[in-house]
Structure formats: C-alpha cells, structure tokens
Design a protein with these regions (language model features):
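C-terminal and inter-domain tail/linker signature
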Residues: 1-201
C-alpha cells in the first residue's frame, strides 16, 4: 500500500469500521501521538475504539494530500463529543514508516457558520489537478510562509496572493486582500498578533 492508502485504511478501521484488530495491523506499536489529550502508543488508540463506536462518531474526509511518507487529511468529525464538541473540522497529519502509521499530529476546531463571503471551513475544490506544478506550488507556499507570516514583509503580499481572486475559508475573514487586511487590522486593535517562528517540513 502507498502511504495514502495505508492512512485511509487506518482511519477507516478506527472511525468507520471500529475494528481494533484491523487497526492494530496498521499502527506501529510505538506510534507517536502529538495530540495532548491522547496518550502515545498504539494501545491507547485501540482501547479508544469501542468508545468511539458507542459515541456514534462519523468522519467525513474532504481532502487527502500525500507526499513521501507524510499524509494530510482535511476532515469533519460529527457526533464528536469524545473530542470536545458536537462537530469539529480538523487537519490530521500522519507519518508512515515501514508500512505502518507511525506518527500523528492534528488541529481541531468547532465548525462555524459560513464566513462573510459565504465560504465554509471545508467547501471548495477537492481534487488536485496540477500535479506537474507540485514543486513550484510547494516552493510558493513555503516562500509565502517565510516571507509574509514569519518575517512580516507584508509589502510583498501581492507576490503571493492574487489581487483578483483570493478565496478565504477562515470563518471570520472575507475574500480578497481587503478582507484579509480588515481582519488583520481588527486583530491588531484587539492586541492579537500571529507569530510564526518555525516551518516544519
């Protein structure tokens, strides 16, 4: 199996089929968990499965991005009280090693109403169509994070973001550079500052 196939099969075993036996075959025994609410190791995950089944949790996978041994899922968790809310939207990052899911990071947030431009946290394109541009796109996004978010060189923002069509999925921000600028100004007025210190590859 490819890393993508392996991760999707593991997610199905844990969240769709609630099958600890199948999940055990897909998780490394020394599975590393970065979610602070879940102990590390495969055993805690396997022990959690019956409770997930009883909770009625339903997981919808919207997007899958895979490169090398890393796989990212964009998901919605419904009936997710076990994770702290009725419905959560999440990004899950998995690392695969020796044919097993070996490591996991995630970021979960409650679902919200559409943003001022009518976009939700999960709508939009789901298929990657320009695979021939993967290296260029990765370099562009990495440069954006380094230049704008980390170093704060906001005068160069139009080097990275379209002035004609910039779609925003943040629940509180409207489309376009004007929407982004207004949101950042509002954050500044409230003393909220985004600080990026490291880019992890």
């Amino acid at each position: 199996m490819t890393p993508k196939e392996l991760v999707l099969e593991a997610v199905a075993a844990i969240f769709l089929n609630f099958d600890p036996t199948a999940a055990e075959q897909l998780l490394a025994s020394d599975f590393i968990q970065h979610n602070p609410g879940v102990p590390t190791g495969a055993a805690p995950i396997l022990g959690f499965i019956p409770g997930l089944k009883d909770s009625g949790i339903v997981v919808d996978v919207h997007r899958v991005i895979s490169e090398g041994d890393m796989v990212v899922l964009h998901t919605t968790y419904n009936n997710a009280q076990a994770f702290g809310a009725e419905t959560l939207v999440g990004f899950d990052v998995f690392r695969v090693e020796d044919g097993k899911v070996a490591e996991h990071w995630d970021n979960l947030t409650p679902i919200t109403a559409p943003n001022p431009s009518g976009h939700t946290q999960t709508d939009g394109p789901t298929d990657v169509t320009d695979l021939n541009k993967t290296a260029d796109n990765k370099a562009l996004v990495t440069d954006f994070v380094e230049t704008i978010l980390k170093n704060g060189d906001v005068d160069r923002i139009t080097d990275f973001l379209s002035t004609e069509r910039y779609i925003q999925h943040n629940s509180n921000i409207a489309d376009g550079l004007d929407g982004l600028g207004a949101a950042l100004a509002g954050m500044a007025e409230q003393g909220i500052e985004m600080v990026y210190t490291d880019v992890h590859f």
